């Protein structure tokens, strides 16, 4: 136990809380797709972004973005998610990893293939 003078001299250091409690300091997490739907982005942009609701292996539910053109993900498929927000979709802080588990890669992709799970 510290005395009052010791506390004044060196105050207690706060532990930094990590923001991403859902991933729990893991780089990726596996989950089951519950629902696939579209969302519209923030003000200057206009599109229908494909998103999916996922129940993770720690029983928490999140909404993740499906990157790339076209997708072949359905309900009850397994998917691997990573952190990383989508700039024009508020509240979506996770992305699906294409080419892992039941999610197929982007077809006919020539550049940035590793990001979209496309083989050469």
Curated annotation (Swiss-Prot):
The question of whether Chaperone is a record keyword is answered with no
Keyword list (alphabetical) reads:
Apicoplast, Plastid, Ribonucleoprotein, Ribosomal protein, RNA-binding, rRNA-binding, tRNA-binding
**What does the UniProt entry say about where the protein is found?**
Plastid, Apicoplast
What's an example of a GO molecular-function annotation for this chain? Answer: rRNA binding
Would you kindly state one Gene Ontology biological process term found in this protein's UniProt entry? translation
**A Pfam match:** Ribosom_S12_S23
Domain of life per record: Eukaryota
Gene Ontology CC terms: apicoplast; small ribosomal subunit
User: Where would you say this protein principally sits, based on its record?
Assistant: plastid
What family name appears in the similarity comment? Belongs to the universal ribosomal protein uS12 family.
Subunit? Part of the 30S ribosomal subunit.
Say what the protein does: With S4 and S5 plays an important role in translational accuracy. Located at the interface of the 30S and 50S subunits.
| The protein's name | Small ribosomal subunit protein uS12c
């Amino acid at each position: 136990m510290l005395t009052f003078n010791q506390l004044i001299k060196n105050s207690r250091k706060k532990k930094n809380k990590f923001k991403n409690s859902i991933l729990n300091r893991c780089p990726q997490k596996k989950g089951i797709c519950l629902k696939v739907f579209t969302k519209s982005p923030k003000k200057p942009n206009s599109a229908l972004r494909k998103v999916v609701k996922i129940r993770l292996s720690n029983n928490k539910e999140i909404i993740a973005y499906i990157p790339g053109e076209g997708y072949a993900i359905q309900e009850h498929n397994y998917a691997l998610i990573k952190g990383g927000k989508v700039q024009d979709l508020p509240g979506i802080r996770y992305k699906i990893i294409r080419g892992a588990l039941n999610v197929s890669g982007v077809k006919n992709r020539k550049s940035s293939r590793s990001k979209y799970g496309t083989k050469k």
